[in-house]
């Protein structure tokens, strides 16, 4: 698209001074453009040896990145979906094509019925199916569906957030709860 529009960023305050949330001028200066999908930037094992690809959008990326670096996990790639609509088909095909033997996980911190999961689920599955990816379908890691966006207790929120990051990075896919089931935090 050759249309230039103002960018409106809606972000939690926790990202304003986060040490990982930085961009240099070369990434946003003249002759640059918005990237709908951002691939892996860290040095990991060879693409064909990546065990898991985590797709995510928003603040949870920084939680995943920070924990992956702390644990020194080098066989899990994190791909950011920066624009959900129109859906970035080409960008995701390109990124998922880099990791043909990896498990594919969608991770979000919002409850399943409030985040992007119900929008991206079938679209990501179509990509996996149409391009013969080894993963048959994308797995969900996040909070179960809920009537309220917040748990109401900071301690419970922290516990759930830790569980989400842990499951996304190293959880066994066959033991993950479905979005409508109650996970064991």
Question: Where are the regions a protein language model picked out?
Answer:
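Active-site phosphate/pyrophosphate-binding segments
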Residues: 1-60
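Short coil/turn connectors at secondary-structure junctions
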Residues: 2-6, 49-51, 73-75, 101-102, ...
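Short acidic, glycine/serine/threonine-rich loops at helix termini
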Residues: 18-24, 65-67, 91, 116-119, ...
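A short, gly/pro- and small-residue-rich
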Residues: 24-33, 72-75, 116-132
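Charge-patterned, long linear interaction tracts outside catalytic cores
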Residues: 50-52, 56-58, 64-65, 180-185
